[in-house]
Amino acid sequence: MRLSALDARPLLIPFTTRFAHASAARSETASLWVTVTTSEGVTGQGESCPRPYVTGESVESAAAFVGRHRDELAATVHDMASLEAWEARHAAAIDAAPAAWCALELAILDALGRTAGVTLETLLGLPPLAGAFQYTAVIGDGDLAHFEAQWARYRAAGFRDVKLKVSGDLERDVPKLAALADAGVRVRLDANNLWPNAEAALAYLTALPRPIFALEEPLAPGAFAALAGVAARLDTPIVLDESATRVAHLRDLPGPPDRWIVNVRVSKMGGVRRAVAVVRAARAAGHRVIVGAQVGETSLLTRAALPVAAAAGPALVAMEGAFGTLLLARDVCDPPLMFGAGGRLVVADHPRLASPGLGVA
């Protein structure tokens, strides 16, 4: 395969509803879309969701990364071996711009798979997808009326696992948690780095109705010792999201391994291959895994996350995303790749998953 063109552009798709949490609020996608074209006329598509508060990237900086490396990639990447070699040579640059590399990697993998007539899983040396994937209901930090409307839809659809974005305001958050407790569903909280220190976090968290399954990122990213203290005080696992964007971040985490759950999102990890590597490192260390999603992902990133979830095996405790046109005014493929009844995405219901490359755009 020879790459003849690599192009990057912003992807702007309106949301069907506004989504908010402690770090941001948005009403449309903020994504990078990369298209590669081979000399044989085969195209590949890639997507990522650069976020300043996750990896320090923006759509503009990610597009600039593509521009800086376009010519070298076209000249040197022709197959899986050369793609892996390029990534190894540029590891430090990718560490600093993982979302930018994610969109590039996915587009190249898509083109490689389409050229060879094989699926993403075959390219990665992974088993074919099978069975079903179970997704979580994710509820943003809206007012109580907005929460009630969202939860009513999720509950009617049969969801039994919920991730709730919290505000840090007990009057705002406690009624939501009470409603979820009454429903008997499993609940985890996402604080999006809300509190400045463990004492402030615990003052709020110890006043909440219990139990909760897990707590995501209550403090500044990378505050592992303080996070371990919060986990011990609450007897609740901590979900690492912004604190874990590559394998190195999992080394020497303090305390018992079951105190940590790693949220693996393809975009922030730097693509599907790096995401699988993080999953394998987490499993080897005894940590559990959530395969997460950035708000506003299209079906392409949903597709890319499936082999990552499959690689997690019994360590997988939850999945996020696959909202398709429930959140997006339109998706990149029709029908979109999204969960169905009960939050399940059944592989057999989506024949395009067996198509060459990513098979969705």
Where are these regions (language model features)?
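Structured beta-strand/loop patches that form or line metal/cofactor-binding pockets in enzymes
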Residues: 1-56, 330-333
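Flexible C-terminal active-site loop/helix
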Residues: 4-6, 11-15, 294-361
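Residues at the N-termini of beta-strands
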Residues: 5, 161, 214, 261, ...
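Metal- or metallocofactor-binding catalytic centers and their adjacent structured scaffolds
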Residues: 37-39, 43-115
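Active-site beta->alpha loop and helix N-cap motifs at the rims of alpha/beta catalytic domains
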Residues: 114, 118, 139-156, 170-174
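N-terminal small/glycine-rich loop or linker at the start of catalytic domains
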Residues: 116-141
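Active-site mouth loops of central-metabolism enzymes
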Residues: 132-146, 166-167, 192, 196
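Catalytic core of soluble alpha/beta enzymes
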Residues: 164, 170-304, 308, 328-332
